[in-house]
Structure formats: structure tokens, C-alpha cells
Amino acid sequence: MGRSLKKGPFVADSLLRKVEKQNATEDKSVIKTWSRSSTILPMMIGHTIAVHNGKVHIPVFLTEQMVGHKLGEFAPTRTFRGHIKDKKGTR
């Protein structure tokens, strides 16, 4: 179930302030954030936001196709190392 339309999308206040400040000054430096649950808005297109994955910040360049998605979708938290090999012939 999605979020109610009357509430609007969730974006962390600190992240929104930083994006608005960069839009006003035409600055395109990387913005660090820990807010993986923030929704990507059209005003964020063209910015690079470093999203924390629990260990490091992963830079994500925001494009038009990402609008409406969450920042955390683009910074994976787990590393898949592959399935274990069959141990039948190892004896």
C-alpha cells in the first residue's frame, strides 16, 4: 500500500533544504545523506546525492526516470557473493 496522496511524498527536511540551497546557487556538489527513505522529487534531478548503505556513502546521480522512487533503492546494503557450489565430488 502506498502513501496517502493528501500527505504527499516524504523527504527529510535537511535534505530538502540542501537541495533548495544548491538550486538557488546553481551549485552541483555532492550531498551526503543517511535518509534512504526520502522520495526523489523533480527538483532533485541533476544532483548527485551520496546515500549511506550502512558502511559507506554511495554517490547516486539522479535522473528523470528515478522520480517517485526512494533513495535507498539505488544504494544496495547487501553484497551477493553467489550460491555455494555442489559438494558432491569433493570427498
UniProtKB/Swiss-Prot annotation:
Which superkingdom heads the taxonomic lineage of this protein's source? Eukaryota
Q: Which PROSITE patterns match?
A: RIBOSOMAL_S19
Q: Does the keyword Ribosomal protein apply?
A: yes
Q: Name one GO cellular component term.
A: plastid
A single Pfam family it belongs to is Ribosomal_S19
Q: What does the record list as GO biological process?
A: ribosomal small subunit assembly; translation
Task: Enumerate the UniProt keywords alphabetically.
Answer: Organellar chromatophore, Plastid, Ribonucleoprotein, Ribosomal protein, RNA-binding, rRNA-binding
Keyword rRNA-binding included in the entry's annotation: yes
Which subcellular locations apply to this protein? Answer: Plastid, Organellar chromatophore
Q: Could you give a GO molecular-function term held by this entry?
A: rRNA binding
* Chief localization: plastid
Stated family: Belongs to the universal ribosomal protein uS19 family.
Please give the HAMAP family that the UniProt record associates with this protein. Answer: Ribosomal_uS19
Q: What does this protein do?
A: Protein S19 forms a complex with S13 that binds strongly to the 16S ribosomal RNA.
Protein name from the UniProt record = Small ribosomal subunit protein uS19c
Q: Which organism is it from?
A: Paulinella chromatophora
Question: What would be the name of the gene that encodes this protein?
Answer: rps19
